Amino acid sequence: MPIFKKPAIKAEAGKKKEIPRGLFQKCPGCGQVVPDIELTQNQRVCPRCDYHQAQPASERIQSLLDPDTFVEMDADLKSVDVLRFQGMASYTDRLKKYHESTGLLDAVITGHGILDGYKVAIAVMDFGFLAATMGSVVGEKITRTIEYGTTNRCAVIIVAASGGARMYEGMLSLMQMAKTSGALACHAEEKLPYISVLTNPTTAGVMASFASLGDVIIAEPRSMIGFAGPRVIRETTHQDLPERFQTAEFLQEHGLVDMIVHRKKLRDEISRLLSYFTVML
């Protein structure tokens, strides 16, 4: 036996250290771990690879509008489980869960404010709430925002990010596609501008309705934009898909997106567009 024996270092029970949640985030673009405060200060754009991460609706509004000019509308509207949907978890339980995690009653914040001196009606979807799927409340709030813009003769800006129609509401969800599109048709008849901003991801029923109807359609870099997912299309058509299929860059090359704008330049670009539309307002 050895004369001197080095005692093993034992970890004290129950003292395992963990990194507090919310302090760091792993970038989906480059895989690097980035401090959350650094992402917030950089408008949720990765400082390492420039990947545009999902941005909470409240932060987006703050970055776009002039300070202290935003007035929220219909903040008290919230979804109800009309169909009594049951799955792995009930629709009611899911709504409660996402309300607790985001502080939102549903997946969009709407209102009006001033952008570089121009009055605008604005709706910003928040992917953190049930993948920003469009149910009856989301569709109603967006429709009311469009109607506010029409009544007050101001531009409408909608920042979209969505997984599509909300299956928990069935046909009530699908009819929002027609309702929002109809409101935009009335807005267009008054010769008033609508600027659509597509972020990552914008898909399915949202892309097939109001998100693709802008007078000017802007997309953020590398955003996934489309209707059905690549796997579904591949299995349905039995064909290989083009490289970069359903990316903002691919859609711009094929004329479905007017411009790709970095998030930090988005406010200035929208302001420039509004200056062209001034004669209409």
Label for each model-derived stretch:
Residues 107-188, 195:
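Cleft-lining beta-strand/loop regions that shape enzyme active-site pockets
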Residues 14-18, 35:
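N-terminal hydrophobic/helix-forming segments and targeting peptides
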Residues 162-281:
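Conserved catalytic cores of soluble enzyme domains
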Residues 24, 43:
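Residues immediately within or flanking Cys/His clusters that coordinate Zn2+
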Residues 33-34, 52-53:
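Cys/His-rich microdomains that often coordinate metals
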Residues 27-30, 46-49:
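Short cysteine-rich clusters marking metal-coordination/redox-active sites
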Residues 1-15:
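N-terminal alpha-helical interaction blocks
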Residues 55-132:
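Long, charge-rich boundary regions
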